Amino acid sequence: MHVLIPAAGSGRRMEAGKNKLLIDLEGESLIYWTLKSVFSASLVSWVGIIGQPNDKKKLLNSVKKFSNEIEWINGGNTRQESVFNGLNSLPSNAEKVLIHDGARCLINPDLINKCALELEENDAVILATKVTDTIKIVDNEGYIQQTPNRQNLWAAQTPQGFLVKKLREAHEMAIEKNWKVTDDASLFEMLNWQVRIIEGNSSNIKITSPLDLQIAKLFLKDY
Protein backbone atom coordinates (compact mmCIF):
# COMPACT_ATOMS: atom_id res chain seq x y z
CA MET A 1 0.00 0.00 0.00
CA HIS A 2 1.19 3.49 -0.89
CA VAL A 3 0.77 6.24 1.71
CA LEU A 4 0.94 10.02 1.26
CA ILE A 5 1.46 12.21 4.33
CA PRO A 6 0.73 15.94 4.03
CA ALA A 7 3.23 17.57 6.39
CA ALA A 8 2.93 21.33 6.05
CA GLY A 9 1.45 22.23 9.45
CA SER A 10 2.14 25.90 10.28
CA GLY A 11 2.00 25.47 14.06
CA ARG A 12 0.12 28.76 14.42
CA ARG A 13 -2.42 27.43 16.92
CA MET A 14 0.38 25.60 18.72
CA GLU A 15 2.26 28.92 19.07
CA ALA A 16 5.32 26.95 18.01
CA GLY A 17 6.84 29.40 15.54
CA LYS A 18 7.66 26.49 13.22
CA ASN A 19 6.09 23.55 11.46
CA LYS A 20 4.18 21.79 14.23
CA LEU A 21 5.38 18.41 13.00
CA LEU A 22 8.83 19.39 14.28
CA ILE A 23 7.57 19.90 17.84
CA ASP A 24 9.24 17.65 20.40
CA LEU A 25 7.05 14.84 21.67
CA GLU A 26 8.63 12.48 24.19
CA GLY A 27 12.11 13.05 22.75
CA GLU A 28 11.20 12.77 19.07
CA SER A 29 9.47 15.00 16.53
CA LEU A 30 5.74 14.70 16.06
CA ILE A 31 6.23 13.48 12.49
CA TYR A 32 8.57 10.76 13.78
CA TRP A 33 5.73 9.18 15.76
CA THR A 34 3.40 9.39 12.77
CA LEU A 35 5.94 7.60 10.58
CA LYS A 36 6.61 5.00 13.26
CA SER A 37 2.92 4.10 13.32
CA VAL A 38 2.63 4.08 9.53
CA PHE A 39 5.66 1.83 9.04
CA SER A 40 4.34 -0.49 11.76
CA ALA A 41 1.41 -1.32 9.47
CA SER A 42 2.37 -4.52 7.67
CA LEU A 43 0.59 -3.63 4.41
CA VAL A 44 2.45 -0.34 3.88
CA SER A 45 5.15 -0.60 1.21
CA TRP A 46 5.82 3.02 0.18
CA VAL A 47 5.53 6.38 1.97
CA GLY A 48 5.77 9.90 0.59
CA ILE A 49 5.96 13.03 2.75
CA ILE A 50 4.49 16.15 1.16
CA GLY A 51 5.91 19.37 2.60
CA GLN A 52 7.19 22.83 1.88
CA PRO A 53 10.75 23.08 0.49
CA ASN A 54 11.90 25.31 3.37
CA ASP A 55 10.92 22.57 5.85
CA LYS A 56 12.54 19.71 3.95
CA LYS A 57 15.92 19.62 5.70
CA LYS A 58 14.54 19.90 9.23
CA LEU A 59 11.75 17.40 8.69
CA LEU A 60 14.02 14.81 7.12
CA ASN A 61 16.68 15.33 9.81
CA SER A 62 14.05 14.63 12.47
CA VAL A 63 13.19 11.24 10.95
CA LYS A 64 16.64 9.95 9.96
CA LYS A 65 15.65 6.45 11.07
CA PHE A 66 13.25 6.32 8.13
CA SER A 67 15.28 8.38 5.65
CA ASN A 68 15.88 5.45 3.29
CA GLU A 69 12.21 4.49 3.32
CA ILE A 70 10.47 7.77 2.50
CA GLU A 71 10.13 9.93 -0.59
CA TRP A 72 10.04 13.73 -0.32
CA ILE A 73 7.42 15.57 -2.40
CA ASN A 74 7.17 19.35 -2.63
CA GLY A 75 3.76 20.59 -1.57
CA GLY A 76 1.50 23.29 -2.98
CA ASN A 77 -0.11 26.37 -1.48
CA THR A 78 -2.97 24.36 0.08
CA ARG A 79 -3.49 20.85 1.38
CA GLN A 80 -5.58 20.12 -1.69
CA GLU A 81 -2.78 21.20 -4.03
CA SER A 82 -0.25 19.25 -1.97
CA VAL A 83 -2.21 16.02 -2.21
CA PHE A 84 -2.54 16.48 -5.97
CA ASN A 85 1.25 16.92 -6.17
CA GLY A 86 1.56 13.74 -4.13
CA LEU A 87 -0.69 11.80 -6.47
CA ASN A 88 1.41 12.89 -9.42
CA SER A 89 4.56 11.70 -7.62
CA LEU A 90 3.37 8.17 -6.87
CA PRO A 91 5.19 5.26 -8.51
CA SER A 92 3.62 4.28 -11.83
CA ASN A 93 2.44 0.95 -10.40
CA ALA A 94 0.44 2.54 -7.55
CA GLU A 95 -3.22 1.55 -7.82
CA LYS A 96 -4.36 2.45 -4.31
CA VAL A 97 -3.31 5.15 -1.88
CA LEU A 98 -3.92 6.18 1.71
CA ILE A 99 -3.79 9.88 2.62
CA HIS A 100 -2.86 10.41 6.28
CA ASP A 101 -2.46 13.66 8.20
CA GLY A 102 1.08 14.16 9.45
CA ALA A 103 -0.33 15.50 12.72
CA ARG A 104 -2.24 12.29 13.54
CA CYS A 105 0.65 10.58 15.28
CA LEU A 106 -1.46 8.23 17.42
CA ILE A 107 -2.96 6.23 14.55
CA ASN A 108 -3.20 2.51 15.28
CA PRO A 109 -1.31 0.48 12.63
CA ASP A 110 -4.14 -2.07 12.60
CA LEU A 111 -6.52 0.66 11.43
CA ILE A 112 -4.13 1.55 8.62
CA ASN A 113 -4.18 -2.08 7.51
CA LYS A 114 -7.96 -2.17 7.80
CA CYS A 115 -8.31 0.83 5.50
CA ALA A 116 -5.97 -0.81 3.00
CA LEU A 117 -7.97 -4.06 3.03
CA GLU A 118 -11.30 -2.28 2.62
CA LEU A 119 -10.01 -0.81 -0.64
CA GLU A 120 -10.24 -4.33 -2.07
CA GLU A 121 -14.02 -3.88 -2.11
CA ASN A 122 -14.45 -0.08 -2.24
CA ASP A 123 -13.21 2.83 -4.35
CA ALA A 124 -12.93 5.11 -1.30
CA VAL A 125 -12.82 4.64 2.47
CA ILE A 126 -12.24 6.90 5.45
CA LEU A 127 -11.72 6.43 9.14
CA ALA A 128 -14.31 8.23 11.25
CA THR A 129 -15.81 8.16 14.72
CA LYS A 130 -19.42 8.49 15.79
CA VAL A 131 -20.29 11.94 17.11
CA THR A 132 -21.27 11.82 20.78
CA ASP A 133 -21.96 15.52 21.38
CA THR A 134 -25.18 17.20 20.33
CA ILE A 135 -24.37 19.28 17.24
CA LYS A 136 -26.02 22.62 16.45
CA ILE A 137 -26.18 24.31 13.06
CA VAL A 138 -26.11 28.08 13.53
CA ASP A 139 -26.49 31.12 11.30
CA ASN A 140 -23.93 33.88 10.74
CA GLU A 141 -25.21 35.75 13.78
CA GLY A 142 -24.78 32.80 16.13
CA TYR A 143 -28.41 31.69 16.42
CA ILE A 144 -29.32 28.00 16.31
CA GLN A 145 -31.09 26.96 13.13
CA GLN A 146 -31.15 23.19 13.41
CA THR A 147 -30.11 20.20 15.52
CA PRO A 148 -29.23 17.28 13.23
CA ASN A 149 -29.72 13.70 14.38
CA ARG A 150 -26.33 12.70 15.75
CA GLN A 151 -26.97 9.05 14.89
CA ASN A 152 -26.13 10.04 11.32
CA LEU A 153 -23.11 12.19 12.20
CA TRP A 154 -19.52 10.98 12.05
CA ALA A 155 -16.29 12.92 12.63
CA ALA A 156 -13.89 12.33 9.74
CA GLN A 157 -10.30 11.24 10.45
CA THR A 158 -7.46 9.86 8.38
CA PRO A 159 -6.26 7.66 6.77
CA GLN A 160 -8.57 8.20 3.85
CA GLY A 161 -8.04 5.61 1.13
CA PHE A 162 -8.79 5.71 -2.59
CA LEU A 163 -8.19 4.10 -5.92
CA VAL A 164 -5.46 6.30 -7.38
CA LYS A 165 -7.15 6.62 -10.76
CA LYS A 166 -10.42 7.81 -9.20
CA LEU A 167 -8.80 10.24 -6.77
CA ARG A 168 -6.67 11.77 -9.50
CA GLU A 169 -9.79 12.19 -11.64
CA ALA A 170 -11.57 13.86 -8.71
CA HIS A 171 -8.71 16.30 -8.17
CA GLU A 172 -8.56 17.15 -11.86
CA MET A 173 -12.29 17.87 -11.80
CA ALA A 174 -11.79 20.08 -8.73
CA ILE A 175 -9.18 22.11 -10.59
CA GLU A 176 -11.52 22.49 -13.56
CA LYS A 177 -14.50 23.49 -11.37
CA ASN A 178 -12.45 25.48 -8.82
CA TRP A 179 -13.73 23.35 -5.94
CA LYS A 180 -12.06 23.91 -2.57
CA VAL A 181 -12.24 21.17 0.06
CA THR A 182 -10.56 20.31 3.35
CA ASP A 183 -10.37 16.56 2.83
CA ASP A 184 -10.23 14.25 -0.17
CA ALA A 185 -13.44 12.39 0.60
CA SER A 186 -15.32 15.65 0.01
CA LEU A 187 -14.32 15.53 -3.66
CA PHE A 188 -15.96 12.11 -4.00
CA GLU A 189 -19.09 13.45 -2.31
CA MET A 190 -19.25 16.36 -4.76
CA LEU A 191 -19.12 13.87 -7.62
CA ASN A 192 -21.75 11.63 -5.97
CA TRP A 193 -19.24 8.81 -5.65
CA GLN A 194 -19.59 6.47 -2.68
CA VAL A 195 -17.22 6.63 0.28
CA ARG A 196 -17.23 3.84 2.86
CA ILE A 197 -16.94 4.68 6.58
CA ILE A 198 -14.61 2.58 8.74
CA GLU A 199 -15.03 3.15 12.45
CA GLY A 200 -11.86 4.52 14.00
CA ASN A 201 -11.09 5.36 17.61
CA SER A 202 -11.05 8.51 19.69
CA SER A 203 -7.28 8.37 20.31
CA ASN A 204 -6.56 9.14 16.64
CA ILE A 205 -6.58 12.88 17.30
CA LYS A 206 -5.09 15.54 15.07
CA ILE A 207 -2.55 17.58 17.05
CA THR A 208 -3.69 21.18 16.63
CA SER A 209 -3.38 22.70 20.12
CA PRO A 210 -1.14 22.55 23.21
CA LEU A 211 -3.84 20.46 24.93
CA ASP A 212 -3.73 17.89 22.13
CA LEU A 213 0.03 17.68 22.62
CA GLN A 214 -0.40 16.90 26.32
CA ILE A 215 -2.94 14.20 25.49
CA ALA A 216 -0.53 12.66 22.98
CA LYS A 217 2.23 12.60 25.59
CA LEU A 218 0.01 10.57 27.91
CA PHE A 219 -0.67 7.99 25.18
CA LEU A 220 2.99 7.76 24.13
CA LYS A 221 4.39 7.19 27.61
CA ASP A 222 3.41 3.54 27.28
CA TYR A 223 4.03 3.26 23.53
Curated annotation (Swiss-Prot):
Belongs to the IspD/TarI cytidylyltransferase family. IspD subfamily. The record marks 13, 20 as: Transition state stabilizer. Pathway: Isoprenoid biosynthesis; isopentenyl diphosphate biosynthesis via DXP pathway; isopentenyl diphosphate from 1-deoxy-D-xylulose 5-phosphate: step 2/6. CDD domains: CDP-ME_synthetase (cd02516). It comes from Prochlorococcus marinus (strain MIT 9515). InterPro entries: IspD (IPR001228), IspD/TarI (IPR034683), IspD/TarI_cytidylyltransf_bact (IPR050088), ISPD_synthase_CS (IPR018294), Nucleotide-diphossugar_trans (IPR029044). The gene is ispD. The lineage of its organism: Bacteria, Bacillati, Cyanobacteriota, Cyanophyceae, Synechococcales. Its EC number is 2.7.7.60. It comes from the Bacteria. PROSITE patterns: ISPD (PS01295). The keyword Nucleotidyltransferase applies. This is 2-C-methyl-D-erythritol 4-phosphate cytidylyltransferase.
